[in-house]
């Protein structure tokens, strides 16, 4: 069974969204695609960088996420292949699930967001 990925993104936790948008947009030259106080997407060529607010100001790891056409189908495929399903949350109208791949790496899999 194959999952249909509609977008791959590299997620970066930020404390100050405006400051982060200036850094990634003005300094690094990424193009702003979508902005909100909690979630902002910038692109460089075909890559999407998603800024997500939170983290308490401490250094944190970034992580890889995938948006899929059918989240439930993707979760079945991931578990069938030996991945593990983790915590689920609803973030701004998007259903997100943490998963672990077969090598122990954490990923986020999300359904289609309500904002596009």
Where on the chain are the PLM-derived regions?
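Conserved short beta-strand elements that form part of the metal-binding/catalytic scaffold
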Residues: 31-62, 106-112
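Vicinal oxygen chelate
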Residues: 64-106, 111-114
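Amphipathic alpha-helical segments
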Residues: 16-31
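Aromatic-flanked redox-active Cys/Sec active sites in thiol-based oxidoreductases
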Residues: 14, 44, 68
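N-terminal beta-strand motif that seeds the catalytic metal site of vicinal oxygen chelate
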Residues: 1-19, 48, 62-64, 110-116
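Alpha-helical segments within the soluble intracellular
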Residues: 25-26, 43, 79
């Amino acid at each position: 069974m194959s999952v249909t990925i509609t977008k791959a993104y590299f997620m970066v936790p930020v404390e100050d969204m405006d400051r982060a948008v200036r850094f990634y947009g003005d300094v690094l030259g990424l193009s702003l695609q979508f902005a909100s106080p909690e979630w902002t997407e910038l692109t460089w060529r075909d890559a999407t960088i998603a800024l997500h607010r939170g983290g308490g100001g401490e250094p944190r790891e970034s992580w890889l996420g995938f948006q899929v056409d059918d989240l439930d189908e993707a979760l079945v495929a991931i578990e069938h292949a030996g991945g593990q399903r983790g915590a689920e949350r609803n973030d701004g109208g998007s259903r997100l699930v943490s998963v672990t791949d077969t090598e122990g790496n954490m990923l986020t899999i999300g359904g289609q967001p309500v904002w596009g």
